[in-house]
Regions:
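Structured catalytic-domain cores with a bias toward divalent-metal coordination
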Residues: 1-262
Length: 262
């Protein structure tokens, strides 16, 4: 496990990994930054059953998701799931990563800006995914103030969040308090309600215009997704392993559900 020292190293490692495996690397110039948003697309090597996107590095002080996606690319971890196509976004906030801050270099929290195109990094990502049709996505984050994992997980199969948390628990601790980031949480899962209630709640939250990335993707029609929150108060290697475990369990559940449908 090796944490990238800066965004330039992330770019170099992503470029090298993509070239070594013949993956499709797309660069999206970010206005005013002289930097590119990176996207790596990995086609399914067998008959495709699903498309999964993974987003990391929205906040520059949350390194485990970035390490996770770099390992995913460098270690060719997608090969364990040959029927799934992946779209990987290694770091959404280049200047925040270099500064080690939640916000970008202008002090803006990108994860409150996805309702509009005002912030260059957000505008670039919105355009990059506007025409995609992911079956599900992982918005990988960390909670720097926690000692246990939790997730905001929204799936048509209500058993999936619990199963994902169980897989993560094999790698590290799960949150034990009744609240996470001022939201009720039970067994590592932030309360979500049934599908009708969830949609109503989402629309209420979205009314204030301070959208995190999942709200934008929800508005595009993607209904199955999770935000992972690894605990920033424990060692990095464990947090990275927990991120891998959450992603892998989701992929396995997705494949199994598609196989059952055929």
């Amino acid at each position: 496990m090796r944490q990238a020292a800066n965004y330039a190293e992330i770019v170099a490692r992503v470029e090298a990994a993509a070239a070594a495996s013949g993956l499709t690397l797309t660069r999206y110039p970010i206005d005013g930054l002289d930097l590119d948003l990176l996207r790596v697309d990995i086609a399914a090597s067998e008959s495709e059953v699903a498309r999964l996107a993974v987003f990391a590095g929205t906040h520059g002080d949350e390194p485990a998701p970035v390490v996770m996606v770099l390992e995913f690319l460098e270690q060719r971890l997608w090969t364990r799931s040959p029927s799934v196509a992946f779209s990987i976004f290694p770091c959404l906030n280049p200047t925040g990563y270099d500064l080690g801050t939640r916000e970008n270099k202008n002090g803006i929290d990108l994860n409150r800006q996805f309702a509009r195109d005002e912030v260059p990094e957000v505008r670039t990502l919105r355009a990059a995914v506007a025409d995609d049709s992911f079956d599900t996505f992982v918005d990988a984050h960390e909670d720097p103030e926690e000692v246990g994992f939790y997730t905001y997980a929204f799936f048509s199969d209500s058993s999936w969040p619990r199963l994902i948390v169980e897989a993560v628990a094999e790698q590290g601790p799960i949150i034990s308090t009744p609240e996470a980031d001022e939201h009720p949480v039970e067994d590592g899962v932030v309360g979500q309600g049934d599908e009708e209630t969830r949609d109503e709640r989402f629309r209420e939250y979205m009314a204030d215009g301070e959208w995190p990335l999942p709200f934008y993707l929800y508005d595009l029609g993607i209904r199955d997704f999770m935000t992972t929150e690894t605990p920033g108060m424990i060692e990095l290697a464990t947090r990275v392993a927990m991120q891998h475990a959450a992603r892998d369990r989701l992929v396995d559940l997705l494949i199994a559900s598609r196989s059952a449908d055929t």
